[in-house]
Amino acid sequence: MILFRHMEINIIVKPPFKKLVSAQFLKKIASETLKAQAADPSSELGIVITGQEEIKELNCKYRQLDEPTDVLSFYMLEENPENLTAPDDFPTPPDEATHLGEVIISYPQAELQAGAAGHSVNHELAFLLIHGVLHLLGYDHHETAAEAVMKSHQDIAMKHIREILE
């Protein structure tokens, strides 16, 4: 018997933002981004929409920056200290999912940035979610070359989800 597991995307929208954010919208954006990046179909991902205070606390605790930010990504896969990788045909339990991590987005920050950029809050939320998911998939922007690669993937993903935004 072959078991197929579908991507599981868990979403928490904190109470002040429940009427402002569609969990279904976030799920579609994350799902399309993961598919476009050929992520493991058994992947799991968590998304949290929160406020400025909570994201500021997390930013301070984990990045030592005492200020709010728009999005934080928490990578959950453990780094392998011996740099070992299992062969492609290595057996894994059929129901064992790969938990990529958590993407935390500040709704108020997204709202501010959307206003400054002249587009909708949903457009900004989609961009931030794509950005966060790409971080979980290993993309980064600390060096110029890596930043160009990540920006290219963000642009492709934004074009891919254009229909969802309309």
UniProtKB/Swiss-Prot annotation:
Signal sequence extent: none
PROSITE patterns: UPF0054 (PS01306)
GO molecular function: metalloendopeptidase activity; RNA endonuclease activity; zinc ion binding
UniProt key word Nuclease: yes
GO biological process terms, semicolon-separated: rRNA processing
Compartmental location: Cytoplasm
Binding residue positions for Zn(2+): H131, H135, H141
Gene Ontology cellular component list: cytoplasm
Cofactor: how and how many bound: Binds 1 zinc ion.
Functional description taken from the UniProt entry: Single strand-specific metallo-endoribonuclease involved in late-stage 70S ribosome quality control and in maturation of the 3' terminus of the 16S rRNA.
Family: Belongs to the endoribonuclease YbeY family.
Protein name, per record: Endoribonuclease YbeY
Organism field: Dehalococcoides mccartyi (strain CBDB1)
Species classification: Bacteria, Bacillati, Chloroflexota, Dehalococcoidia, Dehalococcoidales
